UniProtKB/Swiss-Prot annotation:
An individual GO BP term: cell division
Localization of this protein: Cytoplasm
Domain of life from the UniProt record: Bacteria
Annotated protein name in UniProt: UDP-N-acetylglucosamine 1-carboxyvinyltransferase
Underlying gene: murA
Associated pathway: Cell wall biogenesis; peptidoglycan biosynthesis
Functional note: Cell wall formation. Adds enolpyruvyl to UDP-N-acetylglucosamine.
Length: 456
């Protein structure tokens, strides 16, 4: 079995068996956005009142984040895709390493804990192995707000400086438009004293979703979605009910899968302007895109090569670079894919070449000559988006493919294979019962088998 990383090995606890040369047809329901839900869970720490989150996807990352909040003292009740969170009895301001390991989003807790309680201890974050994602912007921004920060033995220890009880609003200019830093600083500044301005802020839809929920809670945040965000700190925040926005990355993945298989599908619900960079490139490459309300329909017969360069929103999302590389690998003509966000996000290239692609990699640029077909293989995905790219490749390929490393896929796609089945793809999840024995959390294509969040 070929592994997505030459330096790592993965337990083959679960894999997907894909019968190739499939076509997609029908309507697929898009789940709530993982990257939004994770930060909204952290934001619930900012109030003592109840927060109700709707449209929360059932994913291993969400379960990990919920367990982190429970450990802090948050009471969580789940029903279907709805979470009720009660943070009034938080007694711990420290996140244990064993719970945060592998979940980068755990670091979001530092802003709310510091701003609300004046102290926080959070391990350095983990996540997908796609290169360096430093937290310098988070740390420098929190220091500017009045935090004293010490990093010892991979633990970030933060306190409010001196005898002050609150962070103090200030002007912060980010060196780069970091999504995580923007979100961390917005949450921290929402309970700070005075006005905070964040320049060169990230503009991603998930940030806008966070600001919308915080404003429902009583925050005073202006101009989210713009390069300069203004936050007037308030004394306290209240509870609210909020629906997580649709996942634009999941939506884009299905659109790309449809284009790669010359298929026609409709995705819904979506927010079309969140997907503009993707749909524009799909249209440029030969797909017909029809937008109607909160749905997008794609029809595709022939694909031609087009160039893309990843960029912060509203540019082409880095999270869809790997799936789009798969599409370009079977397009007519040549194309060039340039990754500008992460330095190690081309793990899929040598695997696609094993399947028959013709891709030459020069640092962060993939030069692609389209081929007519792929051949099915047994492969292991090394990260979340590589796994999605390989599944699309398996659907295109002649013969059968087996994709392992599903612990990555299950972090970011809710019931991915069952949705593909609904669209007509022959795909089966296989379990290694011996390995699964000690697993606390698993995802199944059968909704009845999906573990519920326990009431705490």
């Amino acid at each position: 079995m070929i592994c997505g990383s030459k330096n790592k090995s993965y337990l083959k606890s679960q894999n997907l068996k894909i019968f190739g040369q499939g076509k997609l047809n029908g309507i697929v329901e898009i789940s709530g956005a993982k990257n939004s839900a994770l930060v909204l869970l952290a934001a619930s720490l900012l109030t003592n009142e109840r927060i109700v989150l709707q449209n929360v996807p059932r994913l291993t990352d969400i379960e990990k984040m919920a367990n982190i909040l429970r450990n802090l003292g948050v009471k969580i009740v789940e029903k279907n895709n709805r979470l009720e969170l009660d943070s009034q009895n938080i007694s711990i301001k420290e996140l244990p390493y064993e719970l945060v390991n592998g979940l980068r989003a755990s670091f979001f807790c530092i802003g709310p804990l510091l701003s609300k309680f004046g102290e926080a201890k959070v391990p350095l974050p983990g996540g997908c192995n796609i290169g360096s994602r430093p937290i310098d912007e988070h740390i420098n921004g929190l220091k500017a707000l009045g935090a004293e920060i010490l990093i010892e033995e991979e633990i970030v220890k933060a306190n409010i400086k001196g005898d002050k009880s609150r962070l103090i609003g200030t002007h912060i200019k980010l060196k780069c438009p970091s999504v995580g830093a923007t979100e961390t600083l917005i949450m921290a500044a929402s309970l700070a004293e005075g006005r905070t301005t964040i320049e060169n802020a990230a503009r991603e839809p998930e940030i806008q979703d966070l600001c919308q929920m915080l404003n429902k809670m009583g925050a005073k945040i202006y101009d989210s979605g713009k390069e300069k965000i203004i936050i007037d700190g308030v004394n306290e925040l209240c509870g609210c009910s909020h629906k997580v926005i649709p996942d634009r990355i999941e939506a884009g993945t299905f659109l790309i899968a449809a284009a790669a298989t010359s298929s026609s599908i409709t995705i819904s619900p979506v927010i079309p302007n969140h997907l503009e960079a993707v749909t524009n490139k799909l249209q440029e490459s030969g797909s017909k895109i029809t937008i109607k309300g909160n749905s997008i329909t794609i029809n595709c017969n022939k694909i031609k090569g087009v160039d893309i360069e990843t960029a912060p929103f509203p540019g082409f999302p880095t999270d869809l670079q790997a799936p789009f590389t798969t599409l370009m690998a079977i397009a007519n003509g040549e194309s060039k894919i340039t990754e500008t966000i992460f330095e190690n996000r081309m793990n899929h290239v040598h695997l696609l070449n094993k399947m028959g692609a013709n891709i030459k990699l020069n640092k962060n640029i993939a030069h692609i000559k389209g081929v007519k077909k792929f051949k099915g293989m047994d492969l292991v995905g090394s990260d979340l988006r590589t796994s999605a790219a390989l599944i699309i490749a398996g659907i295109i390929a002649e013969g059968t493919s087996t994709i392992s490393g599903l612990e990555h896929l299950d972090r970011g796609y809710e019931n991915f294979e069952s949705k593909l089945k609904i669209l007509g793809i022959k795909i089966t999840r296989e379990f290694n019962k011996k390995t699964l024995k000690n697993k606390e959390f698993k995802t199944s294509s059968d909704p009845a088998d999906i573990p519920r969040y326990k009431a705490a």
